[in-house]
Amino acid sequence: MVQQGFSIDLILARSKEEATDGKDSMSSRPHIPCAPQPLPPTKYAKEMPRKKDGQDVQEHTTSFQCSLGEQVINRPSANPSLAAMHRSSGSSDEFSPPGSEDDSTESSGRSSQENDTEQREKSPKSDLQRRLRTAFTPQQISKLEQAFNKQRYLGAPERKKLATSLQLSEIQVKTWFQNRRMKLKRQIQDKQHSLVPPPVCYPQTFPYYPGGFPVPLNSGSFYQPRALPFQAPQHSYIPQPLHHHVRMSSHQEQYPPLFGAQYM
């Protein structure tokens, strides 16, 4: 009995030991992921060197490549082929650090924004220059009108003298005279159109000539035939009755004789 109980206890103890050994083995096994995990971000990826000197930039890029290669080598990966690829790529010169594309896009975006701002800054100035119009005072307008009534075209010395007297520039006086001449031209054209009546279309008439066709009035020389006087017939037509001995056939027609009759 003692041996039997001892054997049962041994079996239970062995089963417990096996269970604990299985748990320890499960916990000690490394986790093998299905896909390679991404690398943690580094300070080189966040802030790329933006110095103008080419040597400093090359040093930063080489140190960044070496740090990435060491991280890949030291980190255990499930797929050994990926590790070998990372090792080979770390030593090659064609490795491009992440963030270079972002820097290029940022620089292009900044250049486009700067161009837009420059165009916007230039456009309001040009618009203001076009929209600016000199506001003449009534006294200046009256003096300009008097000078225009005397002389419509001013020479250089006269224009300069008038501009100094009115406290204006020569360009302002010149543009005012040009606009005033155009205004006068339009007024004259409007008056001419109002005085001239609109053209009326009348039907064209032709004279009647008894011996010929109607001839238009604009023809200079034309032939006029001589009109003949009316002549009465010499003998009057008197119808005579038919005799009884004359027989008419179905194929013959008999007409009365004509004595000196004329057809008109």
From Swiss-Prot:
It is found in: Nucleus. GO terms for cellular component: nucleus. Expressed in the ventral marginal zone of gastrulae. At stage 11.5, also expressed in the ventral region of the animal cap (ectoderm). At the end of gastrulation, predominantly localized to the ventral and lateral regions of the closing slit blastopore. At early tail bud stage, expression is maintained only in the forming proctodeum. Induction: By bmp4. Suppressed by gsc, acting in a negative cross-regulatory loop. One of its GO terms (biological process) is BMP signaling pathway. Disulfide bonds: none annotated. The keyword Plastid does not apply. Residues 129-188 bind DNA. GO terms for molecular function: DNA-binding transcription factor activity, RNA polymerase II-specific; RNA polymerase II cis-regulatory region sequence-specific DNA binding; sequence-specific DNA binding. Keywords: Developmental protein, DNA-binding, Homeobox, Nucleus, Transcription, Transcription regulation. PROSITE patterns: HOMEOBOX_1, HOMEOBOX_2. The N-terminal region is required for repressor function. Transcriptional repressor. Cooperates with vent2 in a ventral signaling pathway downstream of bmp4, which antagonizes the Spemann organizer and dorsal mesoderm formation, and leads to ventral mesoderm formation. Acts downstream of bmp4 to repress transcription of foxa4-B/XFD-1'. Binds to DNA with preference for the target sequence 5'-CTATT[T/C]G-3'. Also binds 5'-TGCATTTTG-3' at a lower frequency, and occasionally 5'-TTGATC-3'. Binds to the homeobox 2 (HBX2) repressor element in the promoter of the myf5 gene and represses myf5 transcription in the ventral domain. This is Homeobox protein vent1.
